[in-house]
Amino acid sequence: MNIDTVRANAFAMPLTSPAFPMGPYRFVKREFFVITYRTDPEALRSVVPEPLAVTQPLVHYEFIRMPDSTGFGDYTESGQVIPVEYEGVAGSYTHAMYLNDHPPIAGGRELWGFPKKLALPTLKVHTDTLVGTLDYGPIRVATGTMGYKHEEVDIVEQARHLSAPNFLLKIIPHVDCSPRICELVRYYLEDIRVYGAWSGPAALELAPHALAPVADLPVLEVVGARHFIADLTLGLGEVVYDYLAK
């Protein structure tokens, strides 16, 4: 294979069989279970990178079922998203995500900078209860529950929430382990259609784990929960801050 061919085909690894395809990345009937809780503000400030600003001591703990996603397949994800502001505009910073499918782990990390690790999340309905769990190896590190569809929620408001900017800290090391890329990335969800949204009484339990430290942002009080289903496209990102720029 000559050098020009390598350059022309260099999208992702392996060169001759990339771990994920080029987009667009469309998600159909994506199901969200989001528990919002109050946590320690100092713990939040210690993990959110400047120039993002923490404005309130809240965390959104998410369980997400993705049964139909372009190129990524059928998988489940769980993790923590933090409300922030950037240049006075409200958005969300993705702190940590855990999922059970390699292509979105590889693509998420390499393209956007999603902080994804391999684990075993689930999201199911058990009789009258919506239940989300996260296992890291044999250890249960998160359990979320909510009364199933107790109250309807405005789908226009849910679409507005989904349309807000999202932020990621993308880090790619050089071959000598020094940082080659260290960037704050902004992306948006696009072409959003919300089918339905609901709320209900909710509870969240987080357990300590050395390699899945979700409990480092402790649950002090559950302040709300949402369950909704939507179609959306995961938009490509843009670099808004380069930490290595001189």
Curated annotation (Swiss-Prot):
Cross-referenced SUPFAM superfamilies: Acetoacetate decarboxylase-like
Enzyme Commission number(s): 4.1.1.4
Keyword Transmembrane helix: no
GO MF terms, alphabetically ordered: acetoacetate decarboxylase activity
Keywords from the UniProt entry: Decarboxylase, Lyase, Schiff base
Leading EC class: lyase
Lineage top rank: taxon: Bacteria
Reaction catalysis annotation: acetoacetate + H(+) = acetone + CO2
A Pfam family assignment: ADC
Active site feature: 116
InterPro entries in the cross-refs: Acetoacetate_decarboxylase, Acetoacetate_decarboxylase_bac, ADC_dom_sf
Recorded family membership: Belongs to the ADC family.
Known function: Catalyzes the conversion of acetoacetate to acetone and carbon dioxide.
Protein name per its UniProtKB record: Acetoacetate decarboxylase
Originating species: Bordetella avium (strain 197N)
Lineage: Bacteria, Pseudomonadati, Pseudomonadota, Betaproteobacteria, Burkholderiales
